[in-house]
Amino acid sequence: MALLQISEPGMSPAPHQRRLAVGIDLGTTNSLVAAVRNSIPEVLGDERGRALLPSVVRYLPDRTTHIGYRAQDEAVRDPKNTIVSVKRFMGRGLKDVAHNEHSPYDFVDAPGMVQIKTVAGVKSPVEVSAEILATLRQRAEDSLGDDLVGAVITVPAYFDEAQRQATKDAARLAGLEVLRLLNEPTAAAIAYGLDNASEGIYAVYDLGGGTFDISILKLTKGVFEVLSTGGDSALGGDDFDQRLLCWIVEQAGLQPLSAQDMRLLMVRARAAKEALSEGDSTVIDAVLDSGEIVHLTLTDEIFDTITAHLVQKTLAPVRKALRDAGVTPDEVQGVVLVGGATRMPAIRKAVGDFFGQPPLTNLDPDRVVALGAAMQANLLAGNHAPGEDWLLLDVIPLSLGVETMGGLVEKIIPRNSTIPVARAQEFTTFKDGQTAMAIHVLQGERELASDCRSLARFELRGIPPMVAGAARIRVTYQVDADGLLSVTARETHSGVESSVTVKPSYGLADDDIARMLQEGFREAEHDMKSRALAEERVEADRLVEATTRALETDGDLLSADERAAVEALIASVREIATGEDHHAIKAAVETLSRGTDEFAARRMDRSIKSALAGRKVQELG
């Protein structure tokens, strides 16, 4: 939120001065910048009045760059040095982009994130994105006539921490102060909710160039609450283009193709897809380097048939998000469409059929995200007028937890928790004299650490030596408004503390988040059995270790037969704990516990006598 500057009465400086902040939709295919002028959000155009900036950057041998429309026009003749859809590479490792078989780029494996070899040197996705953001920043400053105090930049709801951090790094490289990263569907909700003063439950169906997001929102007076999110980080309009490209290649029998021909046909495929949004057929014409001529007629029926699986692929996350929110399709009052790909008639029909109502198309689906981001930026800059206050509650898509003994996961912040959020939980030591604790930060829905995604590991050292279970370690998870996580561990007696900010070296592979959620539900019963087994084994280990230590220190309190009986119980627990029956392990643990009750009582008597030895009765009063 904006800081308020307090002046003496009657001495308020520049009472009508506004702080200039913008909203930026950093898209896979196109990017936009918008600002609030006279309380109305509007997209800022370039010198020709064009709102969209193609998210394309071409690198030249003299290390200069062409950005936007010019780069897009030059992509066909210089595909290796013209980077398109860079958003798909943000926060990704080499293995995550290896499936892009039609990509013309020379990828370089580098620590943290894949990079791309160009004539101007090796470039990271962060650097490429920074070129786009810098162009939008300059456009905004030219339009508004002053420097910006910051920007709200939108990201897909399913961007993980690595991808979000990469976006913030790109903004800083472009000279932009990031006021907040905002989920794209949430930005659309801001634009639609405030424009129409609507209340109720809404679905935001966002099919952009490279990602698909679905958000279920509850809009009430002054409050935007995200009930659930879902989506596919590797599904977008580009995939429809790719499928159409494959169809063109198949129909024309064109194999193999040069990178330049591939890029030319991709441009033709995209143009044909867009033409079908206005008519029921179009002609695809192209002349290749080899002299071959491509001339094909594409009808909407053919296009719908070859892309039907992609349309259906978007509906699976929709069903999941509705289940998570606890609502049915007929409870949804309206469906907001976001992203240029939602102009496809097949998408609009599928969404309408699923929800039983035509989707809302009041606002331009290409612009709605930027408009919502501009409104949020205006608010964060402190420019809102009385009565314009509203609250935005966003959520995290995957649970965050910590590994405990036995390889179990203790969830600290469950998925779909509203952010920003901070949650803390206390843990203790497992062994006597334990002076350090390893903290393993995890992300996912499974019960075992081995089935979740590892985000970070760090150690808390300097814990005072105590008996097992006496130390108190408070672990705090804090997720900021941008979805970035920091974890702090503090021993409450001594005050020793350690922390980590989670910036993973690279993001989740395509479809990993959706897969993790699906596995969490599919394997729930198996996971609970595995968790029960692990918990009983941990309890068995704890009791066996404690009883063994007790025999070492106070074994003289038992007769030879009594000691042999206890040792037999210990051996039985150890053997049964190697099995898979958690009920049997629990029974064995309870038998050992009952079998050592008398031993525990004798140890307690000895401890009390030792504590009272040599002390007078008066001292005890």
Curated annotation (Swiss-Prot):
SUPFAM superfamilies: Actin-like ATPase domain, Heat shock protein 70kD (HSP70), C-terminal subdomain, Heat shock protein 70kD (HSP70), peptide-binding domain. InterPro entries: ATPase_NBD, Heat_shock_70_CS, HscA_NBD, HSP70_C_sf, HSP70_peptide-bd_sf, Hsp_70_fam, ISC_FeS_clus_asmbl_HscA. GO terms for molecular function: ATP binding; ATP hydrolysis activity; ATP-dependent protein folding chaperone; unfolded protein binding. Belongs to the heat shock protein 70 family. GO terms for biological process: iron-sulfur cluster assembly. This is Chaperone protein HscA homolog. It comes from the Bacteria. Chaperone involved in the maturation of iron-sulfur cluster-containing proteins. Has a low intrinsic ATPase activity which is markedly stimulated by HscB. Keywords: ATP-binding, Chaperone, Nucleotide-binding. Coiled coil: none annotated. It holds the Pfam family HSP70.
